[in-house]
């Protein structure tokens, strides 16, 4: 096992699932960086499957992903749930006429890609609610989804946490929350990385405040 304490400049390669909120991932990674330690953080973005393959090949030190792994099926890999948050539907004015969630049938929707865990959960939720929605597009980037939604008068999806300040303006309105559909955040790492200081800090940090949304 590597003694990372002896390294003068710690390299920390992190893969980030492209479907996750970059704002929340950035806050998670804050724990990896401390002033009195020389750390070189490198972040890479891709799909969960591609990142998991790179982690297995020792090309990454950790993955921040939207789904866990089964340690019994992935020998030598561990996953830890960092947190989860509900998602909201947003749009620009004027607001839909019907109440939520029936209003989701009034406009075309922008959702996370169906290859992401959240995208699949939302599609199942639409079916469970008996909603006949029209999907205009699938986006993994929240900022791009917001910009495209404003241009095309569409309803789009983002973490409810964004109500705190990210979407706290008059042009974007939260029309409804789905608390039982959660966007999950998991840290996945190899056994050889357990002693890495950055891995230890991320795994030992309490992120409960980060994943607590503001009240409506």
Tell what function each PLM region has:
Residues 1-9:
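Alpha-helical "hinge/linker" immediately C-terminal to small N-terminal DNA-binding modules
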Residues 9-71:
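Central regulatory/effector-binding core of bacterial HTH transcription factors
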Residues 73-80, 85, 144-194:
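Beta-alpha-beta core module
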Residues 11-15, 63, 110, 156, ...:
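Short, well-ordered beta-strand segments
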Residues 47-51, 56-59, 66, 115, ...:
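Hydrophobic hinge/microswitch elements
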Residues 107-129, 195-197, 203, 213-214:
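Secondary-structure junction motif
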Residues 24, 173-216:
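A late-sequence structural motif
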